[in-house]
């Protein structure tokens, strides 16, 4: 029984420390939601709704903007993320569901 309490205490303190690290990382940062669709469509509407509310759910309350990058069946946006975007967790891709099968069906 004593070991169980000690394990729970260790687990809870680890979670609290992780949340503090994330809050420090995202404080005063800007998230960019790269959407592989044009302005005014369904994906754009979802992304803009998410951008308005995401700051309340990420420690540090980062702001969020939407960047539309249509073209190539999501490949243009995916290539941007892979080749250009910073790899620090501040850029998120929102793509069509076909992006995973496109290379298999249209080589």
Predicted regions and their residues:
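Sec-dependent signal peptide recognition
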Residues: 2-9
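Enrichment for repetitive, rod-forming helical segments
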Residues: 9-11, 39
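Hydrophobic h-region of N-terminal signal peptides that target proteins for export
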Residues: 11-19
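Conserved hydrophobic/amphipathic secondary-structure segments
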Residues: 23-107
């Amino acid at each position: 029984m004593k070991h169980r309490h000690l394990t729970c205490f260790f687990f809870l303190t680890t979670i609290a420390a992780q949340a503090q690290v994330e809050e420090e990382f995202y404080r005063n940062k800007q998230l960019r939601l790269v959407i592989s669709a044009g302005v005014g469509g369904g994906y754009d509407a979802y992304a803009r709704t998410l951008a308005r509310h995401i700051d309340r759910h990420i420690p540090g309350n980062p702001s969020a903007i939407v960047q539309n990058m249509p073209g190539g069946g999501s490949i243009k946006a995916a290539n941007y993320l892979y080749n250009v975007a910073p790899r620090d967790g501040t850029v998120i891709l929102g793509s069509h569901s076909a992006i995973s099968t496109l290379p298999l069906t249209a080589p």
